[in-house]
Amino acid sequence: MLAVLLALGLALRVAAIVPYAMGPNTYSDDNGYLTSGITFARTGYIAYADPGLQTTAIGPGMPLLLGGLIALVGADPAGLVAAHIVFSCIGLLTAIAAYLLGALLCSRVAGLIAAGLCVLEPALLSVNIVFLTETPYMCLNLFAIYFLLASVREWRWGRYWAGVLCMCGAAFFKGLGLLALVAPAALLLRRRENLRPWLLRACAALAAFVLLFIPWWVRNGVLTGEFVPFTANRGDIQLMGSYIGFGYPEGTYEEAVLQSDREAWEQGYQDDMERRFARRGEMGKERLWQWFTENPLAFVASHLLYKPLALTVSHLRTVDLMPDRLMALVWWGCLALAAWGLLCPRLGGCARSGYYAPAVYLLVATLVTAVYAPLPRYGVSHVPIWLVYSGAGLQDLGGRALRLLRGKDEIH
């Protein structure tokens, strides 16, 4: 059954890609990542939108991944279509991870439903077919959570190292990948296990992480003279986030951008995009501090309630696969099923050890991600975990419906 779902997912993704002569492109961040891949394949340098400018604005993950694909299939139109298809298959690996996690926490049926939802959910399909970091990140992140939870449930070095390497791989795309540790930590605390053996294991994981990232840190230090662990903050998201929520200081994001651009021209650094984005970050921090000091209750409510909720209910559409309202309706339905999946174990539903550990991760990751701007693109990384609970919820509802029908048949 899982193979059938994966075949269906591949067919849908290929059908969504091939109408575009060079593969779908939103001419936004994905275009910058494509440029970074082509640049890395040809020069070995990590750049972004400008092929001639090395940068720390993105992590090494996308240049390495896309650079490898471009080196294999080329950058001509047919090669780009092939690269999109191969890239979208990573989304199908995410469905496999959802199946494994659902089976680990609930049942194989719940895992199959979760995998099917990952294959069919419009936002995930929409993201999988374009070159965005979210596709490889959420795949590696979900596998990391699965392997780390499995190693806590039944210790094996192989599982543990698989989880650690997947987590480090996710961090190559987004530094938030390290938050995967929250899930096994929650399970360890819940089970009140002796943590001494885990100190040695944690040290081994830390050593592996440092060894993997040392080349990146050295490269960034030589390039910028600073320690940049993952990526340099581009600043515009910080500024944008200071205009989202309750009771924030007056003004608009567009006005602030115009002001920062005017300063850049007046002070002669209009061609230095890194410095211009850094200035926006400074303006964002100033506004956030002003917001906190002038209206602390609104600031706290915005960051603990409004932004996380906005991040959760939003959905991302990169290309026109279906009407936006229909995509929103599908996502709301998945969230409703996930809510029931989180509740049903308290009402006699199926749940195995560690069932709520990914939910703890989801809470922490949502709060951290929503600190700045709760953009739909940032929320899509959490969709597969929501769908794992959606699968559990749908299985539980189906089981209750079957029992109800059988009860009626026995009465008659």
Report each predicted region and the residues it spans.
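Loop-to-helix entry region of an early transmembrane alpha helix in multi-pass inner-membrane enzymes
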Residues: 56, 60, 64, 74-93, ...
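Membrane-interface transmembrane helices that cradle and orient dolichyl/undecaprenyl
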Residues: 144-160, 170, 189-192, 394-397
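Membrane-proximal stem/loop segments at transmembrane-domain junctions that anchor or position
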Residues: 221-307
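Transmembrane-helix motifs of polytopic, lipid-linked glycan transferases
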Residues: 7, 85-106, 139, 143, ...
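Short helix- or helix-capping micro-motifs
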Residues: 9-12, 87, 114-122, 126, ...
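Membrane-proximal lumenal/periplasmic loop motifs of glycosylation machinery
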Residues: 18-31, 42-67, 290-291, 295-299
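Short acidic/glycine- and proline-prone juxtamembrane loop motifs at membrane-interface regions
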Residues: 123, 129-137
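Transmembrane-helix signature of polytopic, membrane-embedded enzymes
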Residues: 81, 95-120, 139, 160-162, ...
